[in-house]
Amino acid sequence: MADLQGRKVFKVFNQDFIVDERYTVTKELGQGAYGIVCAAVNNQTNEGVAIKKVTNVFSKKILAKRALREIKLLQHFRGHRNITCLYDMDIPRPDNFNETYLYEELMECDLAAIIRSGQPLTDAHFQSFIYQILCGLKYIHSANVLHRDLKPGNLLVNADCELKICDFGLARGFSIDPEENAGYMTEYVATRWYRAPEIMLSFQSYTKAIDVWSVGCILAELLGGRPFFKGRDYVDQLNQILHILGTPNEETLSRIGSPRAQEYVRNLPFMPKKPFAALFPNANPDALDLLDRMLAFDPSSRISVEEALEHPYLQIWHDASDEPDCPTTFNFDFEIVEDVGDMRKMILEEVFRFRQVVRTVAGENGGQQAGQQPGAGQVPMPSGGQGQWRTEDPRPEEYMGHNANGLEGELALGADGRR
C-alpha cells in the first residue's frame, strides 16, 4: 500500500496495527479504553519495545487533549530512569487521522500484576519500589507537574525490579498560586482508591501532596497485599479513609469546601485513628512511620517528596546526588486550546518533529536511544509477577459519577463540580 510505505500491518486484538517496517510484533500486551498495546522487536538491533496505539483520539475533545498532553509530557521527561522512555512516534495515515502510535520502553509487567500474583514480597522490595517512585515523582514535581493518577497499574516493573512511572494523560500543572491550581481540573479524575481526600472534599486548591497520598496508598497496598482504601463508591471511599485515619480536627474540617460534605463528616460519630502497627503488625516500623506521614488526612501536614526521600526507611537507597530535578519546567499553555482541528495540527507537529529528532540522534549514536540505567543495584522480582502487563483498576469513565446525585456526586467530582 503506497500510503504505508516503510511500514507493516499486523493484527493485534483483531485490529490493524501499523508499525515501522524495522519491527515485528511479538505479543499482545493489553487493551483498554484509550488504545491497545503490543510488544515488538527491532529486527536490526534485536531490542524490544512496547508499541501503544492510541485510538479514537478525536472522538471526544477531552481525549484529543489527553493524547496531546501525554505526547508532550513523555517527551519532556524522556531520559529519567524512573519514567518510561519514549523512543518514537508515528501517524501512518496523517490525512484525517484518528490514531497515534507511541514506541516506548518494554517493561515486563506492572506493579499491580506483581501484587495480585500473590508472590511473597520482602521489605527490600517495598523500599526499592517506593524509592524509585519518589525519585520519578521528584523529577515530575520539579517541572511543576502533578501526575494525578499514580497507582500500581501505572508503575511498570522489570525482572530486576527497575520501576518506571507511565501514563501522563491526567497530569496537570502546579503553581504556587492557589487560584491558578483551582482551574486545572478536568472531567476525568484519578482512580478512586488512590485519590486524595482533599480532592473529594473540595479543598481550596490542589498541591503536590495529592501525589504523595497516592504513593502512601501504594505503600499500604504493598504492605497488605491488597488495595488499602477500596471504596465501592465515593461515599464509601471517604468512610473507609475516616475509619482508618479518624475524624479530622476542626481546622481541617473548616477547610472542606463542599458544605454538604462538611456537614456529612461533622455528623458522623467521632472516630479515633487506628494505629498502622495494628493493621500491619509485621511491617518495618520505619515503613509505618513513612506511611503515617504520607497518609496525613490534611495535605498541609503530609510529608513532601523531598522529605520522604530523606526518611530513615529509604536510607539504604537515598543519594541526593543521584536524585535530579527536571532541568526545565513544563509549559501547559496548550491546555487553553479548545478547537479539535487545532489539536489535530498540534499532535501532527509534535509527532513529526519528534521523529526528526530521534532519527538524528539515532544516526549519530548508531542505535535506539534508551533511558538511563538505575544507579543502584536492584532486588530480584518474585517469579510469579512476570509476563503480566497493564492490569487495570477502574478507568476514569467508569467511575465518573456524573449522573450521581447528592453527596456521591459532589465527592465524585470534588472541586471540579464547584467551578
Swiss-Prot record:
CC terms in the record's Gene Ontology section: cytoplasm; nucleus
The active site consists of 149
Q: What does the record say about the knockout?
A: Reduces the radial growth rate by approximately 31% and produces fewer conidia. Inhibits significantly hyphal growth upon high osmotic stresses and in the presence of cell wall stress agents such as Congo red, calcofluor white or SDS. Accumulates chitin at the hyphal tips. Leads also to a looser distribution of spacers. Finally, the size of lesions on apple fruits and branches shows a reduction of approximately 46% and 43%, respectively.
Cofactors, names only: Mg(2+)
Among InterPro entries, the record links this protein to:
Kinase-like_dom_sf, MAP_kinase, MAP_kinase_CS, MAPK_p38-like, Prot_kinase_dom, Protein_kinase_ATP_BS, Ser/Thr_kinase_AS
PTM text:
Phosphorylated by the MAP kinase kinase mkk1.
Q: Which residues bind ATP?
A: 29-37, 52
The reactions it catalyses are:
L-seryl-[protein] + ATP = O-phospho-L-seryl-[protein] + ADP + H(+); L-threonyl-[protein] + ATP = O-phospho-L-threonyl-[protein] + ADP + H(+)
Q: What's in the keyword line of the UniProt record?
A: Activator, ATP-binding, Conidiation, Kinase, Magnesium, Nucleotide-binding, Serine/threonine-protein kinase, Sporulation, Transferase, Virulence
Could you tell me which residue ranges the Protein kinase domain spans? Answer: 23-314
| The EC number(s) this enzyme carries | 2.7.11.24
Q: Does the keyword Nucleotide-binding apply?
A: yes
Could you tell me the Gene Ontology terms of the biological process aspect for this record? cell integrity MAPK cascade; negative regulation of glucose mediated signaling pathway; negative regulation of mitotic cytokinesis; positive regulation of calcium ion import across plasma membrane; positive regulation of calcium-mediated signaling; regulation of fungal-type cell wall biogenesis
Could you state a single Gene Ontology molecular function term?
ATP binding
Q: Which top-rank group of organisms is this from?
A: Eukaryota
Keyword rRNA processing appears in the UniProt entry: no
| Family label | Belongs to the protein kinase superfamily. Ser/Thr protein kinase family. MAP kinase subfamily.
Function comment: Mitogen-activated protein kinase, part of the mkh1-mkk1-spm1 MAPK cascade that regulates vegetative growth, conidial formation, colony surface hydrophobicity, osmotic stress, cell wall integrity maintenance, carbon and nitrogen source utilization, chitin distribution, septa formation, and pathogenicity.
Q: What is this protein called?
A: Mitogen-activated protein kinase spm1
